[in-house]
Amino acid sequence: MNEVSIYPGCSLEGTARDYRESLENVCRMLDVPLRELEDWNCCGATAAHSLDERLAVELPGRNLVLAEKAGRDVVVPCALCYNRLKVAEKELLRDVEGRYRYRIEGSVGIYDLLDFLSRPDTIQRMVDRQKVGLEDLKPVCYYGCVVNRPPKVTGAVKWENPVNMDRLLEELGARVVDWPFKTDCCGASHAMARPDLVFALVRKLYDRALAQGANCIVVSCQMCQANLDLYQEQIGRYFHKDYYLPVFYFTEMIALALGARDQQRWLKGHMVDPAPLLDSAGLM
């Protein structure tokens, strides 16, 4: 497998360090060669495109220039970073008037981490190296609303009903539960300004997941993980309900299946303690 650049984005340096630790474990155990993109910068996330259209393209655009200089495809763990890099790619490639300061050739691929790790050959490598079964886990797969939309930008084929996470976890033995809210919005950054809105959106996700028989939720987006994990106790109090639905990154599920020994290093960062579920499933 050729070496690829990883664009970690800001959150993997802070609030989503558990995501980074689990993905680094997975890539190491699968012999996937990742090298952090040198001198990367913030993509602008939700702030830049609400303030300055040019800045919203040039911030991620600079990272694409760096990636082309490195000559390696780019893997992006963060759903929003991936979206912004794809937007920048599209805008810069059609910028014939020289509106933006950066130029790219489109010579490197930009891949969402989930897409990258759910390739058939990579999944087969996981299955070949699997140490622990996930048969007692019944997750719903929650993709969120950003990574696949708009499809004209992301190139997603099944943007309303993605299945790559479902198939990956099924190959590792998990009893994946189908549900209709795979790509519904969790409220994202509105958790600060409109917690009532986020609470209502996330409550709907909890209730449907439980009604479908799930015992956990698996995500590929840091913002989704934060809203579903960080606020679960508060949402329960707000609606007078007692929820227990551990929320995992899909990379944590892979790491568990591969028999990672330092799982406590990242699982301890969860607000909803996954230990009772993992203990009962023989995974701790």
Give the role of each language-model region.
Residues 1-284:
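Iron-sulfur cluster-binding electron-transfer modules in prokaryotic oxidoreductases
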